[in-house]
A protein has these predicted regions:
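Active-site bordering "gate/hinge" segments
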Residues: 1-305, 313-316, 323-324
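Acidic, glycine-enriched loop/beta-strand segments at the rims
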Residues: 310
């Protein structure tokens, strides 16, 4: 099934279109982004059961306008039809005159107008089990069953913690030539265990994630055997002798290393400060010729998946951070 659209966005869209028309009377370019989301986090451990709101939920609006020289943005959390003029006046009187407040020795950099190719769509991700239909009680029951099953695997295990978090978010983007809506649901599942090793406590962790609903609870059960194996391996493990080693990593570990080293390592401030070691490896071999690492919202159906971009065609093309090593 597809994630349905937001009723609030459907209600506010005609008002936002009126606001856009009002802004375009003053500015050559204007756009409006609306976000409406909801979600919960469930956690079960020895300490008890916790149900909280997902920390990433949000509701609000952002307007961007261009005055022929620079851009200004204005964020607000509520709008009705009788507030259209007041929002437009707030932008005109308090947002765009920002350049007048600059020191005399500072100049305003001129920016070109954003290309506004025509795109009109509404896209949604798929799911099998809607969290709200399953209900809090059943979700907690299923998470508790996963925890109890994991605890029963080995009497040496002193704690198992299970958690599940989901978010359903909706975004609407309007500009003179764009009318784009996305409806996305993502879910994360986590299972963590503790086992003693002498006076130490060793911890193992596993997780699953993706676009979808509470069908992820089935995936969490499959994480129990490897988690228990990790815990037992850690309980009998010995520290590695300090030194330099050539390591063969699992793909998920390699991905994390590449993210940290070549993602954060190529941030512009690191280049300017001559702190980016990655600068020396651009164009060089950094992995096996078998390795190609993709990036971008279209690379996988995951928690970072999205459809809505200023230039939507770019989203459909996964970029390659590493191509054939």
């Amino acid at each position: 099934m597809k994630v349905t659209s937001s009723r609030l966005i459907e209600q506010k869209k005609p008002i936002l279109k009126q606001l856009l028309d009002r802004l375009l009377q003053t500015y050559s370019y204007a756009s409006i982004l609306m976000t409406d989301s909801k979600g919960k986090q469930y956690t079960i451990s020895k300490q008890g059961i916790s149900i909280t709101e997902n920390m990433f939920v949000e509701l609000g609006y952002v307007v961007k306008v261009y005055d022929g020289e620079s851009y200004g943005e204005y964020a607000f959390s509520h709008i009705d039809e009788n507030e259209i003029d007041s929002v437009a006046e707030e932008i005109k009187n308090h947002v765009m005159p920002w350049a007048k407040k600059l020191p005399d020795d500072m100049k305003v950099k001129q920016y070109p107008e954003i290309p506004d190719e025509a795109y009109h769509f509404e896209k949604s991700t798929d799911y099998e089990v809607l969290p709200e239909e399953l209900g809090d009680e059943e979700i907690v029951k299923r998470l508790g069953a996963v925890r109890e099953k994991a605890m029963a695997q080995d009497e040496k295990i002193v704690e198992i913690k299970t958690a599940c978090v989901y978010q359903i978010y909706h975004k609407l983007f309007l500009s003179p030539n764009k009318d784009m809506t996305q409806n996305v649901m993502w879910t994360n599942g986590m299972i963590m265990g503790l086992i003693p090793k002498g006076e130490e406590m060793k911890m193992a962790f596993d997780s699953c994630s993706g676009c979808g609903g509470m069908e992820i609870l089935d995936d969490m059960e499959t994480k129990i055997p490897p988690l228990v194996q990790k815990l037992n391996d850690l309980a009998t493990s010995e520290p590695i002798t300090p030194g330099e080693y050539d390591c063969i990593c699992a793909p998920d570990v390699t991905g994390m290393i590449v993210h940290e080293a070549f993602g954060h390592g190529v941030e512009m401030d690191m280049f300017v400060k001559k702190r980016a070691l990655a600068e020396k490896y651009i164009g060089e071999y950094v992995a096996s010729p078998l390795v190609t690492m993709h990036d971008g919202a279209a690379a996988a159906s995951e928690t970072a998946t999205f459809f809505l971009m200023m230039r939507e065609h770019l989203r459909r093309i996964p970029s390659s951070l590493i191509k054939e090593s």
